[in-house]
Amino acid sequence: MKQYLDFLKWVLEKGKHKENRTSVDTISAFGYQMRFDLSKGFPLVTTKKTNFSAIAHELLWFIKGDTNIKYLVDNKVNIWNQWPYESYKKSQDFQSESLKEFIQKIKDDNEFAQKHGNLGPVYGKQWRDFLGIDQLKKVIEQIKNNPNSRRLIVSSWNPSEIDTMLLPPCHTLFQFYVNDNKLSCHLYQRSADAFLGIPFNIASYALLTFLLAQETNLEVGDFVHSIGDAHIYVNHLEQVKTQLKRNPKELPKLIIKNKNIFEINFEDIELVDYEFDPIIKGEVAV
């Protein structure tokens, strides 16, 4: 996707060296926006292989209101593992297990998973139970019954619970917009890992828009992505330069078989005609 490559170029050109809460410094710039016409294909990055299975499972995890990594690791999704592991290492139960051993315990021992696999009241909790309000269900009802509303908003940023989250929400608020029988989505993201995170975030909220459009009998419109602190970790610079040498391919298509968003399973979502360049690996900063 040209929009994503242009974003990477912008961070490299405008960004400044900056320290942060992790042990890895960044090249950081502030304030950027991308727009994707979802009718022209599903916006999954093609200039490196991007793990759609992980993206879809994570979104379904959000939709279910789940905040425990057990569902994810049971489905071979490991993008959240590091945070509960770091928390576990500080607990009295820690017995010098490696990350791999910790994850195996999450898979094998439900009691252990319940105690040590939870991330706190992160995305799923806020979407489905923000101080007792099911925001996702409510916004779907509003889209169906009052599509011209300017209040079609879901917020993941709950100041009263931020300190109890292992990682506060990076993608903090999204708004829907209905026009000409098309559903569009606008995401505001406070913090954006340009190399590892943004390809996931684009695809995740595009998928959410497709799911809600089907649920509400609408076509898909645009996905608009606004970013606050956009950064490339310094240990990702070579990977980004490699990716910028590649040319985007045609976007894949998405087939959704189940109309009810609250009953949908991974098997109901099919990605077709996805062509991609080889994977480019990078370490996540915790």
Swiss-Prot record:
One GO BP annotation of this record = methylation
Main localisation: cytoplasm
Its annotated pathway reads:
Pyrimidine metabolism; dTTP biosynthesis
Q: Which PROSITE patterns match?
A: THYMIDYLATE_SYNTHASE
Pfam families in the record, alphabetically? Answer: Thymidylat_synt (PF00303)
Write down the InterPro entries for this protein, in alphabetical order: Thymidate_synth/dCMP_Mease, Thymidate_synth/dCMP_Mease_dom, Thymidate_synth/dCMP_Mease_sf, Thymidylate_synthase, Thymidylate_synthase_AS
Entry keyword annotation includes Nucleus = no
> Which residues make up the binding site for (6R)-5,10-methylene-5,6,7,8-tetrahydrofolate?
51, 193, 285
The UniProt record lists the EC number as 2.1.1.45
Enumerate the residues binding dUMP: 21, 150-151, 190-193, 201, 231-233
Show the catalytic activity: dUMP + (6R)-5,10-methylene-5,6,7,8-tetrahydrofolate = 7,8-dihydrofolate + dTMP
Subcellular location field: Cytoplasm
What name has this protein been given in UniProt?
A: Thymidylate synthase
- Phylogenetic placement of the source organism: Bacteria, Bacillati, Mycoplasmatota, Mycoplasmoidales, Metamycoplasmataceae
